[in-house]
Regions:
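Small-residue-rich hydrophobic transmembrane alpha-helices
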Residues: 3, 16-74, 78-80, 111-125, ...
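Short alpha-helical transmembrane segments in multi-pass integral membrane proteins
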Residues: 42-107, 148-188
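Residue-level micro-sites within transmembrane alpha helices that shape
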Residues: 21, 31, 101, 107, ...
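Transmembrane alpha-helical segments of integral membrane proteins
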Residues: 140-149
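Short amphipathic helix-loop junctions that connect adjacent transmembrane helices
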Residues: 3-7, 149
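Interfacial/gating helices of multi-pass transporter permease domains
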Residues: 6-24, 92-98, 126, 160
């Protein structure tokens, strides 16, 4: 559906989104790798009721993910133009590509936190909470994009909808994890 909204702004914007998402994927694919490792680590230690080890592993992965997100943010926000030019050097695409990378750059740390938090939940065998939050907030991108694109933001409204939904997911999921983890300790 977002592609349909973007298509109203022309082929250049579609290309910008495709290339921009591939560039941005470097951070979320890496964070996904951390989440997969964390899922296995949490699951193994949850089975042996080693909560101290779980907490230590989560802290280490969280710091690595925040560092990854910070590097991605710096790269996308401050070096978006040279990065984008590596992939597309068409003058009419560059300003839009830089906007895409900059706007998505602001969400890199929360996005990394979102992804590893899902890995933590999965390690505990709790898939409903992150699934519901992810589905609702990812789905919220559509009405947000429709609203934002009707303003002076234009196609940048789609990029803001994507970025804001990631920021909210990366802010809400850790709170739910904290509450879930607190409940787990009380039940253990």
């Amino acid at each position: 559906m977002l592609a349909r909204i973007i298509s109203h702004f022309g082929a250049t914007e579609i290309a910008v989104q495709k290339v921009g998402s591939q560039i941005e994927s470097l951070s979320w694919i890496t964070a996904d790798g951390f989440a997969i490792a964390l899922c296995a680590f949490v699951g193994q230690n949850f089975g042996s009721r080693n909560f101290d080890r779980i907490d230590k592993g989560i802290r280490i992965i969280a710091m690595m993910s925040i560092f990854l997100g910070a590097i991605a943010t710096i790269g996308l926000v401050f070096f978006g133009e040279p990065i984008f030019r590596v992939f597309i050097d068409e003058p009419q695409s560059i300003p839009s590509g830089v906007n895409y990378l900059r706007i998505l750059g602001y969400s890199q740390i929360p996005m990394c936190i979102e992804i590893i938090t899902i890995g933590m939940f999965n390690g505990f065998g709790e898939t409903k909470i992150p699934a519901v939050i992810s589905i609702l907030l990812t789905g919220a991108r559509i009405p947000m994009a429709l609203f934002f694109t009707s303003t002076a933001l234009g196609v940048n409204g789609v990029w803001w909808a994507i970025s804001l939904s990631s920021i909210v997911k990366g802010s809400i999921l850790p709170v739910f994890y904290y509450l879930y983890r607190k409940k787990m300790v009380l039940e253990a």
